[in-house]
């Protein structure tokens, strides 16, 4: 099986392809998650005309190195349909890539991905037979307005999708075996974020967590991929681990012991509710005693990614909670932010704090 992977020319790339079998209403999806290097995450649309050689090199590299290990980036969603066409959505870079055995199959698959409703909130209503139809619940494709045609119009009909695919295939000189790249608009994340803003506002009002923080975490964790799954089994928009944050949520917020299912956490409303509830648990329980609200927010962000234990170990060698909190309270806001972004024991968490705090300005 071949998966088409798109990267800018000259990008440093490491990735591992892992499988998760997910069967909504009897339809088998093959969901893949890839590891990309930091150099791959530059924003903006690529020069599509220069991709054929790059794609071939990347495919060759994948077959040679597919057993390499690496941390997952959950912003990739891909599946293989019943006719063996392979479709991949990169929610971070805003690219859709499709691979098929011939031109006719490629066009069918491209039209399908532009029109299908793959939102997990309604995915259980889809079967293999109706894959490719606009879902009756929303009347709009999942990628509506994130992809526009050559007229700049959102794609919601088979006619418009087919015409746009024909134009792209001609531009990219598609031949057999057939591969096609469909770009999303530059502001695709802004369009995607609007789908989930209502959930964030509802959870914010319930748990007293800023909407900007919730949205910034969603973008950082999944790039608004509602079916995101990491190698460590963190799920959905906010990358919730069922047996840790999920269990804490049900125990503390709902008052009973329960581990949420994958299906539960793939539902966007549930995921945002559980994730936001867990942020409030961090604030009110694990990080209680940090008095300055801005320092508490920074501590919440770092702990959501790296855990409170690693935060405390970063602050004091013993990892003692009270000693760590006392040190936070003794710092200025600026000193604590500098510490988190320069002295935390996990480099990933240092970068995470920088990214989330920067994104909060966009949603504030």
Q: In which residue ranges do the predicted regions lie?
A:
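Cell-wall glycan-active module
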Residues: 2-8, 12-22, 27-28, 32-219, ...
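Active-site metal-coordination segments of metallo-dependent hydrolases
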Residues: 188-191, 262-272
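Amphipathic alpha-helical recognition patches that constitute DNA-binding helices
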Residues: 213, 236, 299
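Structural recognition of the beta-strand scaffold that forms the well-ordered cores
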Residues: 216, 237-239, 303
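Secretory-pathway/luminal and periplasmic proteins that interact with or process carbohydrate-rich
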Residues: 222-231, 247, 306-317
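Substrate-binding/active-site groove segments that recognize
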Residues: 231-258, 270-281, 328-331, 356
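Short helix/strand-bridging catalytic loops that position acidic/His residues to coordinate divalent metals
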Residues: 257-264, 289
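Catalytic and binding regions of secreted/periplasmic enzymes and modules that target cell-wall glycans
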Residues: 271-320
């Amino acid at each position: 099986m071949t998966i088409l992977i798109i990267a800018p020319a000259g990008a440093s790339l490491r990735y591992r392809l892992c499988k998760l079998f997910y069967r909504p209403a009897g339809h088998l999806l093959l969901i893949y998650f890839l590891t990309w290097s930091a150099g791959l995450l530059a924003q903006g649309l690529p020069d599509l005309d220069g991709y054929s050689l790059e794609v071939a090199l990347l495919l060759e590299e994948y077959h040679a190195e597919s057993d390499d290990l690496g941390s997952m980036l959950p912003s990739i969603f891909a599946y293989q349909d019943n006719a063996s066409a392979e479709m991949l959505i990169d929610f971070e870079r805003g690219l859709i890539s499709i691979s098929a055995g011939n031109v006719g199959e490629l066009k069918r698959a491209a039209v399908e991905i532009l029109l299908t409703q793959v939102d997990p909130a309604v995915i259980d209503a889809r079967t293999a037979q109706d894959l490719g139809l606009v879902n009756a619940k929303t009347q709009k494709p999942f990628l509506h307005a994130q992809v526009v045609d050559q007229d700049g119009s959102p794609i919601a009909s088979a006619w418009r999708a087919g015409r746009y695919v024909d134009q792209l295939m001609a531009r990219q000189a598609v031949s057999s075996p057939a591969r096609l790249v469909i770009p999303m608009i530059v502001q695709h994340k802004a369009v995607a974020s609007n789908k989930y803003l209502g959930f964030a506002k509802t959870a914010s009002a319930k748990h007293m967590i800023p909407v900007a923080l919730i949205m910034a975490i969603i973008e950082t964790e999944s790039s608004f991929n509602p079916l995101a799954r990491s190698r460590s089994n963190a799920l959905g928009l906010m990358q919730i681990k069922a047996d840790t944050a999920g269990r804490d949520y049900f125990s503390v917020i709902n008052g009973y012991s329960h581990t949420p299912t994958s299906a539960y956490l793939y539902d966007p409303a549930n995921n945002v509710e559980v994730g936001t509830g867990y942020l409030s648990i961090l604030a009110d329980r694990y990080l209680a005693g940090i008095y300055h609200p801005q320092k508490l927010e920074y501590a919440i962000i770092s702990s959501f990614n790296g855990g409170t234990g690693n935060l405390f170990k970063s602050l004091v060698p013993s990892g003692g909670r009270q000693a760590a909190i006392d040190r936070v309270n003794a710092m200025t806001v600026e000193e604590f932010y500098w510490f988190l972004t320069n002295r935390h024991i996990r480099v990933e968490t240092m970068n995470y704090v920088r990214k989330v705090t920067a994104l909060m300005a966009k949603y504030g």
